[in-house]
A protein has these predicted regions:
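Helix-loop-helix junctions that connect adjacent transmembrane segments
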Residues: 29-30, 107, 139-268, 272
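Membrane-interface loop-to-helix entry segments
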Residues: 96, 109-166, 196, 220-224, ...
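Membrane-helix boundary/coupling elements in multi-pass transport proteins
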Residues: 15, 56, 79-93, 196-209, ...
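C-terminal membrane-solvent junction of multi-pass transporters and transport-like membrane proteins
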Residues: 1, 133-140, 306-316, 353-386
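Membrane-interface "cap" regions at the ends of multi-pass membrane proteins
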Residues: 1-18, 23-28, 41-45, 57, ...
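Transmembrane helix-loop boundary segments of multi-pass membrane transporters
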Residues: 20-25, 30, 94-109, 129-138, ...
Length: 386
């Protein structure tokens, strides 16, 4: 559980989407990741207070329902399902972008269709795919990012053989630290949120453990470490090694750094790791969207026939419905191949921002209600809340 909590949702949002963030904010992309990370961190603490005080069966929409009524629960529930359906689409397009480097003659839409079909079949055949693969995927991603930080950090400081001196000046050369202005840095923060999608699931899962207070506190701490080490530090390495205006918005800057450093085979290995990360998050998104649909059915907000399962207990209909947006993205990738992925990333970031704001608003209402009626249940409190 701890390993999945640290590396589970690291996918295209970091490995590929960071290129678009750097293109918007320049070296100040580091600030965008810090701002988004702070928003996520405090949101998880607010969510953690509600999870411990008022267990809601793993559904964020339940807290919106408790705070603002059934309509709010309905909107947040379907909004959350829609977000993960879009994540399925984004990760499929990202996987196609990576595969396209090895088979340049094949169009991106065909590769996106191949990735999406393969993962759909894998999830429909066996419900155990998620549990059996996610821990391994997380281990690969954690190891790869640590290696990237070591190699890239040494190169940026001029301590790597053949580096030719420190490249840290890339942080303020080429137009300055925030070459596009600070408004662009704030705009990039919304795109950054895509990279943090999934961290909220771990908090709710920890709340369902035998010791919810300890589990939630540990989950939030793990997220803090991940924000600092995986996101902020790795982006700092990228913009220190590469001039920001050479970073491709649709190609992994992590691979570009390894190519720049020139370690034999490192770029290929990183390309494989990025592809594994994309498959990992695509796998998790299919699982999560189907689980969210079951929650909507339980609440009476979705038709019951969508909850049908196969003889092996696989929620086939829920999984297939969660891939509909992905197949629409395949068509869009055929028509607008250069615009699909940035659009999907921005859409996911906007949905997550709304979700996080609703979680915080729900905590204000639910938290105040619990403080008045059952203050003894507040064993885990939101910081700075009266």
């Amino acid at each position: 559980m701890a390993l999945i909590a640290i590396g589970g949702s690291v996918g295209a949002g970091l490995f590929i989407g960071s290129g678009a963030v750097i293109g918007l904010a320049g070296p100040a992309a580091v600030v965008s990741y810090v701002l988004a990370g702070a928003l996520v961190f405090f949101t998880l603490r607010a969510l953690g207070e509600m999870v411990v005080a008022v267990p809601a069966g793993g559904s964020f929409s339940d807290y919106a329902r408790l705070a603002f009524g059934p309509r709010a629960g309905f909107m947040i529930g379907w909004g959350y399902w829609w977000m993960y359906a879009v994540v399925v689409a984004a990760e499929s397009v990202a996987g196609a972008t990576i595969l396209g480097g090895g088979v340049p003659g094949v169009p991106g839409w065909a590769l996106a269709l191949l990735v999406l079909l393969s993962m759909t079949v894998a999830n429909v055949v066996s419900v155990r795919v998620f549990a059996e693969t996610e821990s391994f995927f997380s281990m690969v991603k954690v190891a790869a990012i640590v290696a990237f930080l070591v190699v890239g950090g040494l190169w940026a400081l001029g301590l790597w053989s053949g580096s030719g001196g420190s490249s840290v000046a890339n942080l303020w050369q080429h137009g300055g630290f925030a070459p596009q202005g600070w408004v662009a840095v704030l705009a990039a923060t919304v795109v950054v949120l895509f990279a943090f999608g999934g961290v909220e699931i771990v908090t709710v899962a920890a709340g369902e453990s035998a010791e919810p207070e300890r589990g939630v506190a540990l989950a939030v701490t793990n997220v803090l470490w991940r924000i600092g080490l995986f996101y902020v530090a790795s982006i700092a390495v990228v913009v220190a090694v590469l001039p920001w205006d050479t970073v491709d918005a649709v190609r992994s800057p992590f691979v570009a750094v390894m190519e720049h450093v020139g370690v034999p085979g490192a770029a290929v290995i990183m390309e494989v790791v990025v592809f594994v990360a994309v498959l990992s998050v695509l796998n998790a998104a299919m699982y999560t969207s189907s689980r969210m649909l079951f929650t909507l059915i339980r609440q009476g907000d979705a038709p019951r026939f969508l909850g049908g399962t196969s003889g092996r207990g696989v929620p086939v209909r829920a999984i297939l419905l969660g891939t509909v947006v992905g197949y629409a993205a395949v068509v869009a990738d055929y028509v607008w191949p250069e615009r699909v992925f940035p659009f999907l990333v921005s859409s996911i970031g906007a949905i997550l921002l709304i979700l996080f704001l609703v979680i915080c608003a729900s905590q204000l209402v639910v938290g105040a209600r619990v403080r008045r009626r059952e203050p003894q249940r507040l064993t885990l409190r939101m910081w700075a809340f009266p």
